[in-house]
Amino acid sequence: MLTRSGYIVNNPPPEIKKELTVRAVVNDDFGFPPPPFKVFRPTKNGICVPRYYGTSKLGEPAEDKRPVPTRINTRFHGTLRDATHQNAALAAAIDAGHGVLSLPCGFGKTTVSLAIACKLGYRTMIIVHKEFLANQWEERIKQFCPGATIGRVQQNKKEVDNDFVIAMLQSLSLKEYSFGDFDSVGTVIVDEAHHICAKVFSQSLFKMCPKHIFGLSATPNRKDGLTKVLHWFMGPTFFAVERENQQDVEVFPIEFECPRFRDPPPCTRFGKLSLSTMITELTENRDRNKMLVDLIKRITRGTRQLLVLSDRRQHCMMLQQCFPKTSGLYMGGMKEADLTESSKKKIIFATFSQAHEGLDIPTLDTVILATPKSDIVQSIGRIMRETKGKKNNPNIYDIFDQWSVCHAMYNKRLRVYKHGGFKMPKMKEEEPDDFARGQCLIKL
C-alpha cells in the first residue's frame, strides 16, 4: 500500500529490515566507520520503506491512498538548449515521471527542472540544503516562471499554499510537521540529491510521497557506498550526461616540495592518518602560501577571473588579505549581498564546500585547487559554464604535494582530467616560464 509517507510493508521479513539498515563505508586509514542507521520507519503493523525500494523489491502496491495533489497553471518562459541536452532531459523526465537527473555543472539542471515542473503542472516543492541555493532557486523561478507564487519551508516558516515551495533539507529532517502538511505537493525536486543518503537527511522524504520526485546531482555516485539510498527514494537515473571532449580546458599541474615532506604526514593517537591536521598544516606553510600568492599574481595579470579553492576558511581569509582591492570571499554564513559583491571581483576565494555545490558565477574561467582533494568534478565545473562575453578557455591550476596520500588524491584528479579530454601540456626544458607550461617543480 502506498501512503503519504511511503510504501507500507505489513509483517516484513527480517531480510528487508536488514537490507534497509545501512552503514557508510569509509577508508580505515582515515578513521573509524560510523554506526549503521535504518532507512525505514515503524508502523502499526509493519514498516514504511522508501517508495522505489518497495516497488523494486515487492512490486507495485495494491492500493494508493495518497491524497490528490494541487494543480498549478504556471508557464515556463525560457528556451532549452540542445547543446547541453536540456530538451532531451525534459523529454526523459516526463517519460520517466521520477528518478535521478545527472547533468554536469553549467548544463542547466535548474532550468530543466523548472520546465519539468511546469510541464507536469503540480504544486512543486524544491528541497535544498543551503540558504544561498534557496535564494538562487527563487531568482530562477522569478526569471523563468514569472507570476508564480513562491513560499518557504524553513524553521518556523511553512508557506505551502504556493505554486513553488522552497524547503530547507535540515528543517524537513529535524522538525516535526503536522500530519498532511505536504499533501498538496505533487512534484518534489531535490537539489544536490546525494545529500539525502545521510542518516538524518534521509528522514526528510518520509514526510511526503509525491506523485513525481526528481533528484538533481552532477555527481550522484557517493564514495561511501550509500548511493543505493538515493535510488530507493527516487528510482533509477533516467538521464545522465558526462562532460567529455573538452579539449579547450587546460590543466597546469604544479608540484610543491618542502623538507617537511621527507617526514611522515601527521597521524592521530590511534596511528591513523589525520587528514584534517595534514590539510591545516599545508594551509599554514609559509613557503607554500608564498607560492600561491605568486601564482595568483601571474594568472591575474590578464583578463581572467580566478576562483581559488581551499578546504579552510582561515586559509581563504589569509590569502584574500594579500589582494584586498581585487578579491572577495565566497563562503558559508555570508550575507547574500556580500556574496553578490564578491562574485564581481577578479579573484574569488572560496571553500570547496561552498563551491562544490551551487556556486553560480558564469564569468569564472580559471581555478586554483589550493588544497588536496579527490572529488573535484563539481568544483572544476564552476569555471565551465558558457556565457556571453566569456573570452578565455577554462584553466585549472592543480597544486599537488609530496606526501603519498596527496599523490593518491592527485592520481584520482588525473583520471578526471583524462576522462574529460582536458589538455595537459608537458614541460619543455627550454620554456622560460614554468607556470605557462603547466608542469613545474617549485622549491622555495
Identify the residue ranges that each predicted region occupies.
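Conserved RecA-like P-loop NTPase helicase motor core
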Residues: 219, 328, 332-420
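Conserved helix/coil segment N-terminal to the catalytic DExD/H
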Residues: 154-187, 198-203
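Post-DEXD/H (motif II) to motif III coupling segment of the RecA-like Helicase ATP-binding lobe
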Residues: 186, 194-255, 417
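A conserved SF2-helicase RecA2
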Residues: 228-253, 258-268, 377, 385-444
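Conserved interdomain hinge at the start of the Helicase C-terminal
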Residues: 116-117, 268-311, 317-321
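Conserved pre-motif I regulatory segment
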Residues: 36-39, 62-102
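Walker A/P-loop
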Residues: 96-120, 125
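Conserved helicase ATPase core of P-loop NTP-dependent helicases/translocases
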Residues: 135, 148-161, 177, 307, ...
